[in-house]
Amino acid sequence: EIGSGLVGSEMCIRDSFTTFEKILWIGSIVLITGSAVMFGKDGILSVIASLIGATSLLLNAKGNPIGQALGVIFSILYAIISFSFAYYGEMITYLGLTGPMALAAFISWIRNPFAKGKAEVKVNHIHRGEVLFMFILAAVVTVVFYFVLDFFNTANLIPSTVSVTTSFLAVYLTFRRNRFFAVAYAANDIVLIILWSLAALTDISYISVVVCFVIFFVNDIYGFVSWSAMRKRQAAEIQP
């Protein structure tokens, strides 16, 4: 069943993008590559991670499970970049939380297609009780990670801790196939733009990472718009 979902995803990737989405992807690639060329150190690794990340976000915006698979790869590369600047919070978050949850989301999305053989996940709605549970769990994770990050003398502790909170909310909602995952990721992008801007004050090469998350922010906003439209369309198609 998972194999057939993958085949469907691969077959539909090329033909499913709108003109706007193609422009968005090409624009993201050009800006990411340009910023990496302009700024030296870690440029190659940053650009590879960013290109994978941008492609992942566009596929996620389409509800395509392949986007989550690319998200696992991005998590590993981003953790390496974070380690280079002693952002242990980011490293631990992406290796211990975002990466594994992206893998879990990949499996969840593959197992819950909107229609058999289609490379589009079924949009899910979560109720108030689960929303409350999610925020309580996020609070617990935040407190635990604060002390862990403090123990490792993490650079810029407060924004690093806030990033853990937004990352957790994002990966939880992604796993649950809820459209607000894109809003949580957009919030996380803002935190990371601030975080890496602080890093860029010390090492200008990290400007390429800042550019990466500005682009991610734009893609995540589009992801929410896309999922909102997808939710309405799926609801209309289900109606008898």
Annotate the PLM regions.
Residues 1-8, 12-13:
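Single conserved hydrophobic/aromatic residue that forms the stacking wall/gate
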Residues 173-240:
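C-terminal transmembrane-bundle signature of multipass membrane proteins
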Residues 21-33, 49, 137-139:
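Alpha-helical transmembrane segments
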Residues 58-70, 172-184:
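Membrane-helix interface "capping/anchor" motifs
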Residues 33-44, 61-63, 84:
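Short, hydrophobic transmembrane alpha-helix segments
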Residues 140-154, 161-180:
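Alpha-helical transmembrane segments in multipass membrane proteins, preferentially the mid-helix core
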Residues 93-109, 124-149, 170:
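Alpha-helical transmembrane segments of multi-pass integral membrane proteins
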Residues 63-108:
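Hydrophobic/aromatic-rich structural module bridging two neighboring secondary-structure elements via a short loop
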